[in-house]
């Protein structure tokens, strides 16, 4: 094969005229010519991002035109996802910078909350209105963008909402003292890399049950980070977490599949140019992956009890450098309680 100037060699408007404005047929004609001109025969692998229905229609028609070429694809781990599974030290440094900036934003949100007055059990804005989840999320987005990052969304969920792992938070809910808040933020820096971290906070004070659950999560979190090393099966860390929580009497996805209570998800996932990449810290069947140099993964044990009105999670993103050394890319303290001075 040889590189070509697509616009000079393949006039897209000419294909549209030839196909009387039918964009699907024009695309098929164009790709057929590319395959012919590049003399691509045999098995031809297809990769990329495309609407599933559109891809099916396109590739079915294209295959019918290619007598000497078989179009093939991969499901699950593909050539490109495998290549992206490990990062070199330069990429890890880019991701360390993403972690540093994310920590700065999280610190600014902490200070934003702490800077508000308290009326009864609620936070109050300068205009006298109650501070809401929506206000906090708007401030968070503004700081993400101010530091040159982008995000599609983040989780800032309080009380019962925090007890549902992927609940993003109810925008009009007032910020109240003594309720658990799960703040899960995963912005993307200009170089394209994501960072993923979660902190659990309580404004003013933490109720006993929230504190106990948080301490349990932090205990297993610390053990995991102390034990994780290159060469170990990724599934072992999820098994270790399940064993720990089950021994404390919590339901888990292993003992109570489908339960909304207890520890209900896997331990973590790869992070990189996508927020969810390989490897997976999961006991799912077929997961035989070993931790390798270059792996970057989230570690995020959590406990969730929506009917009791709380959830807690601790999450950092860690990387294994080319020499096998683990480095924590998340740079922010783990304090549970945000002190709220009375004004």
Where would I find each of the regions flagged by the language model?
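Active-site neighborhoods and metal-handling regions in enzymes and metal-associated proteins
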Residues: 1-343
């Amino acid at each position: 094969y040889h590189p070509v100037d697509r616009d000079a060699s393949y006039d897209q408007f000419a294909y549209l005229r030839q196909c009387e404005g039918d964009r699907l047929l024009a695309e098929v004609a164009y790709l057929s010519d590319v395959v012919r001109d590049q003399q691509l025969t045999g098995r031809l692998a297809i990769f990329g991002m495309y609407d599933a229905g559109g891809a099916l229609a396109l590739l079915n028609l294209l295959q019918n035109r290619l007598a000497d070429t078989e179009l093939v694809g991969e499901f699950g781990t593909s050539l490109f996802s495998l290549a992206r599974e490990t990062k070199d030290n330069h990429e890890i440094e880019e991701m360390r910078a993403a972690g540093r900036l994310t920590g700065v934003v999280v610190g600014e949100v902490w200070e934003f909350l702490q800077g508000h007055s308290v009326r009864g059990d609620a936070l109050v804005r300068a205009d006298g209105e109650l501070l809401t989840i929506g206000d906090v999320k708007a401030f968070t987005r503004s700081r993400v963008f101010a530091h040159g990052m982008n995000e599609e969304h983040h989780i800032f969920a309080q009380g019962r909402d925090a007890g549902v792992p992927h609940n993003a938070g109810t925008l009009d809910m007032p910020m109240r003292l003594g309720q658990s808040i799960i703040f899960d933020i995963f912005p993307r820096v200009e170089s394209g890399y994501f960072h993923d971290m979660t902190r659990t906070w309580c404004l003013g004070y933490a109720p006993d049950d929230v504190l106990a659950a948080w301490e349990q999560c932090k205990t297993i979190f610390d053990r995991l980070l102390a034990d994780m090393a290159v060469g170990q099966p990724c599934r072992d860390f999820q098994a270790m977490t399940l064993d720990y929580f089950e021994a404390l009497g919590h339901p888990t996805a292993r003992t109570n599949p489908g339960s909304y209570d207890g520890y209900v998800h896997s331990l973590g996932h790869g992070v990189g140019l996508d927020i969810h990449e390989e490897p997976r810290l999961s006991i799912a069947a077929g997961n035989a992956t070993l931790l390798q140099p270059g792996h970057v993964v989230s570690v995020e044990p959590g406990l969730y009890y929506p009917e009791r009105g709380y959830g807690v999670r601790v999450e950092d993103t860690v990387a294994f450098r080319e020499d096998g050394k683990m480095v924590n890319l998340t740079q922010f303290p783990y304090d549970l309680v945000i002190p709220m001075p009375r004004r």
